[in-house]
Each structure stands twice: as structure tokens, then as C-alpha cells.
Amino acid sequence: MSINRPCVGPVAALAAVIVLNAVAARPAFPYGAVQNKADNTEIRIVPAPGKVVIDGKLDDWDRSGEIFMFVDENSRDTLSLTAAMMYDRDALYIGGHWKDPTPLMNQTAFGGDVSWAWNADAIQIRFISNPAIRSRASTMTGARMPAEEQAFVNNITLWHSTTDGKAGYQAAYTLQYKDNVLNPPGVQGMFARDADGKGSTFEYRVPWSVLKAERPLAGGDAVQMQFQVHWGNDQGTELKTGITDVRNPASNSLGYMGPDAWGLGVFMEKGNLPKIDRVATERAAGHVPVKFSLPNPGKVSISIRDAAGKTVRTGIGAEPYAAGDHTWLWDGLDDRDRPLPVGKYTAKILTHEGIGQKYVCDVGVSGEPPYQTPDGTGGWSGDYWEPSYVATEGDAVILGTGNAEAAPYTIRTDLEGRKQWGTTAAGHTLAVHKGCGYFVAWASDGNLKKFDLATGRMTAFSGGQPMLKAPGAGPRRGLAAIDANTFALSSESEDKLYLIDIASGEAKGDVPLPAPKGLAADGKGGLYAVSGRDVGRVDPKTGAFTPIAKDLDDPQLLACDAAGNVCVSLRGKTMQVWKFDPAGKVLEKFGKPGGRPTLGRFDPAGMLQPYGIAVDANGRLWVCEADREPKRYSAWNPDGTLWKEFFGSLPYSTAGYFDPQDPEKFYAMSVRYLVDYEKGTWKPDATILRTRVEEGVPLGVSPAHPVSVHGGGTIVVRDGRKFLFSAGDRDSFAIFEEQGDAWLPRASLYVATTEVPGPVGKNGKPGPVKKVKTTNFWLDADNDGRVQAGEIVPAGNRFASTWKMNIDAHLNIYTLQGDGWTEPRGEGRATTPFSILRLDCLGFGPGGGLRFAEAARPVVTDAEGGSVNGIAVDPDGSVYVLVSGGLVGRGERAQDTGARLVKYSPSGKEVWRYAKVHCGFAWSSSSYTPGMLVAAFRCSSSGHPDLLPVTGYYGQYFLVDKQDGLFVEALGQDQRSNYTLDQTMVLTENFNGNIFKHPQTGKT
């Protein structure tokens, strides 16, 4: 890849295949991104002109107060909502026209979990039914709303249930979403599909009593309210994109956070209102010509520099142009819209014909394909927790982790392991019975849930509810159907089995059994249980237990095969699944004795922490291995040999990292994978680290993870020695060194908590104990990989701040002195000056241990200031800093706020800046337009010689030319647009990303 950069003219076309190593990080489940708009700050609510018939026609409506809401300019003709509201003495009316290419697709049934009705085609309305209330409450700002005011808060969801074929109305009250109601008396609703199938008309009548209004609202009243409009996927199973509108443009809160973000519903005394013309304000055309020519259609980026070479105006970025001669007109203003003095200015121009994206693979995630697809068959299960449960019935295999954010909690596969659907139905304990699945959760609510195996959707018990309170408390690991009408549920801490009526879900008794865990029915009227360390048959009428195998090695859960044999998952030193016949004879042992190691090379022949198990119709044993690095579901042939293994999902937005000398070694968290970039394949190679504590020193960035999930790690080679650096969110980092297949700890920054007795009081007793926190630094001075107390010192002046830490190719550590970014909570500019400090690595001591300077020193000082989002460092010491200028209000130019991406030379001098930047979550931003670093979250890495990637929160990666600071391209898609769910879509809450130039092939 070569770039020619003449001033005032085109550069050579830049065309390349970019492979960002975010392959380990793709969420496998659509993850909602809602654009917070303020095209409308209020809606005018007019008197109903007469009797209103709820028939979906609106021909008896006065629509003069209606407003128009849409996703973005590219889709305003296909994704929009025109909404109107009316009132009379009895009710509030809500109606309008809803444009959607696949209208009225929402599979939430009235007998299902209607609290998820928002997760497809749905209209949400937040409405305070008391006009005397004006609240700025928000969980973002911490402002509170008194309970007496919250009584008037309505959180309403309107949808057409595809399953029921009717309009639904679900509401919860207060900001805590209490007292849920479904289709309460007096509410009427109707949706009518358009003749062309590209939209629908809807209308609702909602009595004032349902809205908790103290009186009918009328002309002269105004209330806080907001619309939130969701467009789901083609199947109606999950949210694709959405908007909020009727919004307070000065708020940076999201709608669900509280009324600080809401606009107004203004009740008019009369109808037939004159139309309000909304005039869009546009910038005046420029007058200073910048000319360029393209031999072929391409994309153009321009910035303006003054005589000293300083960037004064960020112009266009990757703007598409046809072949031929063109002129871009500059208006003579700087990035803050200030006139520039007369003088000599130079235009820097970059052109290219497009950057191609080549999909390689999704490391650590199974599925065909491993990324989410519109039909729900792509990707894998739960990104949180470890593999926990599996059950089979007929040709269905149901498995999952029980917790997730960006992947389905639970999935169904066929007997070959091909995913068929994903669902939010989940718990800790799973059983399947006659076409339905049943979960028991262990949390305080202890819910018993029922779902349909054909669709994954919640379905109702005989009493009409899909979710009930399960009997018992604490871990309830076993659930099995002992006959056609009864479940047995084990309660380990209570030493009993509960009996549950399958049809109603109601408890109908219990029997004693010591320390029960797994349960399994043999299909012939027999029930097996784990009791303590034994496996045996249990009489569900009396609790009488007859062991068939005693003193097993930490037995967990059970499964029976078609012949009535029973399998048990064993841990401890065994790490296998054993199959017994009814007499207790061992028929088969699945997996390598002792399992696979917790640290070191991955051995597929061994299990690790086997837990949930099931035997399918082909006699294959499915095993959930309850470990997270990696997450593996293994499937075994009846003869005990491994058949297949399935992996994932990784925690959402896991940041992958790589060995710069050998990029085929790719890492996600603490697992090393081997990637073949040409074949697009991967396999786990080793687990390199596990968390541990020595002498009070955590050898990792958190108690759960040695390597940061979202931050990943950086591998650095110095003097032939290979090190791994990973920084936590705050006040933590760890350095490890590779020694064969092991990585030994070499340094740790951490917060220590010491309990200090209070001063002795008059009674002669010490006062309350105080917890004192100090930041300590451990350095492995003798290079033995062990912690000695004498190696621990206070961090002192080595680290001014531990926010946005980074490391360079020489093991120098960079930290921020100044304000680290947090999402702005209010108006105002961020202008605090900042410095980037460097703690120099001084090489190695006599014993081979790392040595660092006693204090960090500033290498960049920026008096203009701002809050820092990210730092990246080149091998030559050049520093890149991503800076936020504070809150960008809806409709405000981010370019005018002081937000910027800046490159500083090794001496700390500004080299260039790029000002089309909206940092952080950018909740008030519009979807991506060419050249905009929208929701810029971090400098992804600095491992490429020519390109600096910046991670976008909504699923994009922005490439900036390192030499001149020109925008090159945006990869991926903004999820707040009408995106395509395919291999280029990373989805929202994207924190990861990395880039490298392959040392052997030269490919980026």
C-alpha cells in the first residue's frame, strides 16, 4: 500500500483489502441501537372532532397536530412514523401512519413475556399524566423524581402481536417500571396494513384512568412525554433499529433514563391547526476553490493548513465523486466557524477508489455462519457466563449459558449442531418435555419459565402466565419430568425435591433428599438423582434413595439415554462423564482421564469442568464445559470418541490482539488461537493465563480476567523477549512475559485496601475500622515470576492517572494527566488542559527483571484541553490523542466543540488534527455521514505504519491517514441506519478493534 501526497492535488488511488482483527468481538445477537433525535421537541394534541371509531382508518381524526419522525435521510421514505394525538373527556387518542418494509412483525404473544414486546416492531410512549410536573430526573445525571410524581409516569408499548393477530397495549408505571398491565379494560387499539405492504395505519384509545390522570387533560395543559419507535427484523423476533423523538435537545440522557430527555405534549384548545413549516438550516456555500481531478470515480478527503502547517479546517472526508474535474469550495472559516486572516493556505488532498473489506473468520465463535443473520440461524449462544445447560428432545438440542447481553441466552440446534433460533428465555436449570422447555432461575425471584421448542418464544402455563415463582431457594440444579404431569426440582441447600405440576407450574409437594443436584428420568418411570457424592434411584413419593454408584469425584448433573442408562458429569481429578447401566456398572467413560489442563495447550480430547449434559436421539453425548476461556460445548460419539466441538460466544465486544511477529497467533482474553488468514479458519491453541493472587497482588487486571475483555492486550518484543501488557478500566494493569507455553507475571499495578482501626474513644475502645485504599506497584525484580513482599511499592509518581493507559514498542507506559472521558451529563465545554506522561522502561536489571523510571515525565502538553478518550503511540514516539470537547447537543456541530483527533510528534509538537469527531456514546448524534468519526470511542491500535484506526461505538472502524491526518474510510455500518445484518456488521457497544500489516504477506 503506497500513498502519494502532493499538496493541492489528488494522491494516488489507495485501494486495499482491510482485515481488522475484531474477529473475536462480534456480538452474535442483534443489539439495539436507538438514535436520539430532536427533530420534534413537542407534539400538539388536539380535541377530537367527534366520536372516534377505533378501526385503523383515521378518517374521523383531526391530524393537524401530527409530527413526522424518521431514522435518517437515506431511509426517510421507508422507515418513518407520522404520529398524531387527540383527546376528549374520556380518553387520549394515539394514531398515525408507520412506514416499514415489513410491517407489523412482532412475535410477542399476549400469553408470552410481554415485557419484551419492545424488541421488534413497536411504538413506545413515555407520558407523565400530570401537567403540573416538570422533572429533570435522569439516571444519567443522578437527578431524582419524588415517588408522588412518579405515580403519574406511564411507560407504554404499542404493538401488533403477529401471534395473536391483534393490537397490544402494555404499560408499566413509575421510573422503576412497576405494576405492569396488559390490554387493560377500556383500551382499544387497531393496526391496519397498507395495501402495498410497506406500512400500516394505527390508532389507540386510552382512558384517562389507565394513564393514572387525576382529571381529564384539556386545552392549556402540557405534559412531558416522548416517542420511541422500533423497527424489528423481518421475522419480528428482535429489534433492528429505532429512534426517540419529541425530545429535549439539551439532554444527553436516553429516554428510559428519565424525563430529563423528554419533550412536551401540548394540549390545544382548538383543532384544525395551521401546519408548521420546518425550515432546515444549511451552511452557506464556500467561496475559496480547491480544485482536483479524478481519473475514475472515487472518494476524496481534504483539509486546510496554514503557512505554519497547522490544520485549521477539516474539510470533507471520503466524500464520493464521479470521475472528472471538481471543485470543493471552502468558506474561509476554521473548524470553530471563525474567520481566518488573509494569508497562504494549503489544501491536503487524499483520493482513493474504495477500501474493500474481506471477511476472514469470527475467532472463538461457532455457527454457520458464526455471525448473526436476519433469519436468526447465524451465530451462537450467550456471551456472558459459561456453558451451563443442554437438553434434547426429538431432533432438537437446546443449549446456552443463562446470561447474555449481545448474544441469545439460549439457542436451538439440530442434531448436527446447526443453529435454528436464539431466544432470551433462560435460567440456570433446564428441562424439556413434550415440545416445551422449562427454566428455573436461582435468583431471588426464582422464576419458573416456559417456552416453545419450535420457536423459542415464551408460552403460557394453564393459568395464562409464562413465568411463575418456582418453589425452593438457592441452587436448584436438577429438573426432570418424572411422569406426564409432574416435574421434580432439586433444592440442594434445603435437602429436598419439590414436585411441580407441569401444566400449571404450581408446586404440589416435596420429599426429602440429602444434598440433591442433578436429576434425570429414564423414560420408564424411574428417576435418578445425585445426592452428595452418590448417584442413585429416588422414589419421588417418599424420597427413598437407592445408590447405584458411591463416592464419585464431585458429581454434578445427570442425563439418561434411550436405553435407560444414566450419565453423570464428574469434576475433581476425573473431569469426565461416566455412563452407568441401571445396576451401576460403568459402561463408558467420555473424555481423557483428568480432562484438559486449565493452563497450557488446548487438548480437545479432554473436558474441563463438565456440567450440563444430555444424550440426543443419535446416542451422542452433549457436554457443557463450565469454563470461559474458551467456552466449549463438546459432543461425543456413543463409543466415547469426540464427535464435534462448538465454541462461544465470547463476551460482547471482546478486543482481540495478536503477536506482531507471528499474527497467526491471535488472542482473545487469555486464549491463544491459531488463525489461517487464507483459509479463514481458526482453532484454540492454548489458555495462557488464569487469574490468581500472590501476597495480596492480583496478577491480572481484574478478579475475573487476567486480560481486559474490552481493552485486550498488546504484545511487545524487546531485546528478544516477548511481553504482554493489558490495562484495566482504572488503577490496574498487568505485564506478563512468554516463557515457552507459559506467560509469567512481571508487573502489576493494583489498588490495595487496608483496614485501619479508628482512634481510641473516651471509652477506651478503638473507633470504627476505616478502609484505606492505596495504589501499589509490583515489579518482578528477580525475574522469578513470583511475588515477594519486598517487590511491592507505592505507585508514587510513576502514574499520574491510570485512565487510558497504553504502551509502546519499547515497553514505555503512557498515562493521562487531566480529565479522562466520561459521557457528558450536562451542557458546557470540556477545556481542562491535559498532558500525556510517559514512564520510561529502563531495560532489565541484573537479575533480568524489568526496570522502570521512578517518575513519569510529560511528552505532550495540550493547553487547549478537553477530556481524553484514547491514546495510541507509534514506535518513533509519536502520540495520537482522541479528545472530547463536551456535550454535543442535538443539531449542534461536533466540529465546533473542540473535539478532535490529534497527532503529536515525539517532541510533543502538534503535527495535525482532525476535527470531525463526536466522541463517546454520542447519544445525541446522527447516523454516520462521510468523514465523520461518529461515536469515536478509542484509538483502536497503532500497529500499522500508515493507518490509524478509531473504533466507533455503533459498529464502525474509521481509518485515518497517519502522515497527514486525512480521513481514509469508514468500515462496517452504523447500526442506527437501515443496515444490512451480515459479516460487515459489528453492532452497537463496539469497543474493540486492531489493525496490523502482516510481516510476511504485507497485507493489511
Regions found by a protein language model. Name each.
Residues 26-275, 805:
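Structural preference for beta-rich elements and adjacent junctions enriched in aromatics
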Residues 311-340:
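Glycine-centered tight-turn motifs at strand-turn-strand junctions
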Residues 367-380, 459-472, 587-605, 647-650, ...:
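Surface-exposed loop and turn segments in beta-propeller and other repeat-based domains
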Residues 378-390, 426-428, 471-479, 516, ...:
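Signature of short aromatic-glycine-proline-rich micro-motifs recurring in repeat-based ectodomains
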Residues 402-403, 442-444, 492, 532, ...:
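Short loop/turn segments immediately following the C-termini of beta-strands
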